[in-house]
Regions:
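Active-site cores that bind ATP or allylic diphosphates and position pyrophosphate for catalysis
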Residues: 1-39, 46-48
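Non-cofactor substrate-recognition interfaces
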Residues: 28-39, 45-263
Length: 263
């Protein structure tokens, strides 16, 4: 339908995904200061709990940057596309970071594993490794795409090709469901299969967000100025030292032509 996409101003987040140090990733740790992270940007932080992969571009050049986390001041090293370094490390910041000379092509990272960003629910299958995606660009973001197979056609396609499991929950009827139900909220714990919850869900961490709507427009009980789920997730990541940049960003977002609400 015409007019279904509209420009909206939302909270965006560049998240830090901690690289697992093992035989596959060891060479990327040479000379690293602090922890090593992949940086990935999203305009929909509410999808981050459903992340199961990161995608790099097949022909994109990547570099490591020694820096400090902007919110915690912890020394760290981050990986992002060389072309996008100026978007995150400006001339005003000179002296606080070091871009390394060594350049890596995207496929060199294929198979490298990272820690789950928000371990609320564990996936039922192989996840949390870097894959190559043919649609990854350096138009914006970091040149590394956060993959949530349950919330994007491209994400689902490349994840399937790479054998990456989507993050499903199992409801009381025994059906696999995305973490967000048809009304636009995270499933409540009591709506999920108890055996699944016991085995795969961290009730303490997930319980804080269970039942929350991903868009405030769907919750009539909220005040107009109530913080959004996107904001709360970004703030939680910031406090945990897992966010690199949080900002407002204007982007095109689909809206229902009947209700005029975001989908």
């Amino acid at each position: 339908q015409p007019g279904c996409y509209r420009d909206v101003k939302d909270t965006t987040c560049t998240a830090q995904f901690r690289v697992v140090r093992d035989e596959r990733s060891e060479r990327f740790f040479e000379g690293v200061e602090g922890e090593l992270y992949f940086l990935a940007w999203t305009t929909t932080p509410w999808t981050l709990p459903s992340n199961t992969a990161l995608a790099v571009g097949p022909a994109i050049d990547y570099v490591r940057v020694k820096c400090r986390n902007p919110y915690t001041d912890e020394a760290q090293t981050v990986i992002l596309a060389r072309e996008l370094v100026p978007s995150y490390f400006t001339k005003k910041m000179e002296g606080t970071f070091e871009v390394e000379d060594r350049v890596y092509k995207g496929p060199e990272f294929e198979g490298v594993r990272y820690e789950q960003l928000l371990p609320w629910v564990r996936p039922m299958g192989d996840a949390f490794r870097v894959i190559v995606g043919d649609y990854v660009t350096t138009t914006d973001g970091t040149g590394i795409v956060h993959i949530a197979p349950t919330f994007g056609a491209d994400d689902n396609r490349v994840a399937k090709q790479a054998g990456i499991a989507p993050l499903f929950v199992i409801d009381r009827a025994g059906k696999e469901q995305p973490m967000v139900d048809r009304t636009g909220k995270f499933f409540r714990i009591e709506e999920l299969d108890p055996a699944f919850v016991e085995r795969y869900v961290d009730a303490g961490k997930y319980g804080e967000y269970a039942g929350r709507y991903v868009k405030n427009a769907y919750d009539d009980t909220l005040a107009p100025d109530a913080p959004t789920l996107d904001v709360d997730i970004a703030v939680a990541l910031k406090g945990a030292g897992m966010a690199f940049k949080i900002e407002k960003h204007v982007h095109s977002y689909p809206h229902c032509w009947r209700t005029d609400k975001p989908v």
